[in-house]
Amino acid sequence: MAEGKAGGAAGLFAKQMQKKFSRAQEKVLQKLGKTVETKDERFEQSASNFYQQQAEGHRLYKDLKNFLSAVKVMRESSKRVSETLQEIYNSDWDGHEDLKAIVGNNDLLWEDYEEKLADQALRTMENYVSQFSEVKERIAKRGRKLVDYDSARHHLEAVQNAKKKDEAKMAKAEEDFSKAQVVFEDLNQELLEELPVLYNSRIGCYVTVFQNISNLRDVFYREMSKLNHSLYEVMSKLEKQHSNKVFVVKGLSSSSRRSLVISPPVQTCTAFSPVSPVTSPTSPNALSVTSESESVSATAEELTSEAVGEDSCESEESLKDEEADEDQSETSSSEEEEDEDEDEDEEESLAACNGPTPTPAPTPAPASPAAEVKSQEEAAPCSPTSSLGRGQTGKEHSPPGEVVLRARASSEGAEQSKRTASVQRTSAPPSRPPPPKASGGGLSSPPGSAEASKACHPRASSDASSDPEPPETGEKEGTGSSGPKEPHASSTKSATQVVSNDENTEL
């Protein structure tokens, strides 16, 4: 009995070794191109899809296992944190009993989430992946049967093409070929039908797994949100109970620590809409965050106003230049008219005081500066009131050339100076003939004529008293001052010459 079993096992082993040898020989011949390999493009495409599906399934299964492991770790961590909070929470603080219920519900919620996630997601994915090994074995078996089929076919062709034909060998070769063909075709047909179905089943598996995950997370986070609201209310009560004990986080204003801003939990009604974190009104950092946002908005407004102001400055400056040119032209024309009126008044007053105009005589030598100063000192006490009024009006009446324009850019300084000089030249009064002068050899006037001329010519006396400096100083001031001051200086000089001529006549 034992010998029969040993002989049967030896025969089976020899048969398997013979198959392996024939398969290896066939593969070598196929690689060398001695024989033709049977190919099925439809099966090859299905097999390629299967291997890709298998790789993706194993990857997703591995990630889900890591996800479940992380949930377990998070559950343990949350449990330890809750237990520690319950231990350090004093019994005389508000919400002590509520905190116990929150800690217990938190642990139960994590446990339920972990169990359902493992059952509805991980086990579903595990069942999906487990079928890959069976299909993979069948594909490998199909490959071996394909080699047997090719080997039997090639052996039959060799027997049929032999010069010496043996009917027994030919019959046995045909029988072997028929068996190999039936086995291969049956297995190949089964795989051609199963592989596409298995490949399409991946969609249903993904839908089922992630629907379960999303539902579990939705329920878990909704219930956890309620617990978080309850915990936040307990901490708010504790804060109100000890409102004088404030904890300030140092370095919170730093840009790298903005995540430390304390925020209340998100409202449950807006769980499916994008929610921005709201700063707690009781937080000591709410004012700092508000001030930072206000400063940012103010900076943005300043940048916007500067950008708009730069655009409008150019147009305003051009308008100001045109207005300034028009004002200067109007001012110069009005000043010319005033100067002409003053000249006419002076000529009339001189004609009235001096009487009939004498015949022109040779011009005498100019008086010395000392004589002019003396004449000015003698003419000064004649009319102090008129000289005082003249000085006040001279101060009040600003020369037309002193139009002050607002300074603009530094690049426009040269253009403004040239423009001011041109305005001064255009605003200068027109040249007029000098007033008549009395000569030493002319008609002699009575002694009282000088006093009468002084009395009748208050303008000259006021000019003389208001400007007691010598002519050289006046000329220096005239050259240093702007152009519109020249008419006043010329009128003062002419009046001084008239007074000096009258004194010479009297002498």
From Swiss-Prot:
Top-level taxon in the UniProt lineage: Eukaryota
Membrane disposition: Peripheral membrane protein
Modified residues (Phosphoserine): S273, S375, S411, S439, S445, S449, S461
Disordered: region residues: 271-507
Known tissue expression: Detected in spleen, mast cells and macrophages (at protein level).
Compositional bias ranges of the Low complexity kind: 273-307, 444-467
Record field: compositional bias (Polar residues): 489-507
GO cellular component, one term: phagocytic cup
Annotated InterPro entries: AH/BAR_dom_sf (IPR027267), Amphiphysin (IPR003005), BAR_Bin2 (IPR046984), BAR_dom (IPR004148), Bin2_C (IPR048886)
Acidic residues bias: start-end ranges: 308-349
Alphabetical keyword list: Cell junction, Cell membrane, Cell projection, Coiled coil, Cytoplasm, Membrane, Phosphoprotein
Any one Gene Ontology BP term: plasma membrane tubulation
Protein location: Cytoplasm; Cell projection, Podosome membrane; Cytoplasm, Cell cortex; Cell projection, Phagocytic cup
BAR domain boundaries: 28-244
GO MF annotations in UniProt: phospholipid binding
Biased composition (Pro residues): 357-367
UniProt function note: Promotes cell motility and migration, probably via its interaction with the cell membrane and with podosome proteins that mediate interaction with the cytoskeleton. Modulates membrane curvature and mediates membrane tubulation. Plays a role in podosome formation. Inhibits phagocytosis.
Subunit structure: Interacts with BIN1 and ARHGEF7 (via SH3 domain). Homodimer. Interacts with ARHGEF6 (via SH3 domain), SH3GL1, SH3GL2 and SH3GL3. Identified in a complex with ARHGEF6 and GIT2.
Record text about domains: The BAR domain mediates dimerization and interaction with membranes enriched in phosphatidylinositides.
Name this polypeptide is given: Bridging integrator 2
Source organism: Rattus norvegicus (Rat)
Gene: Bin2
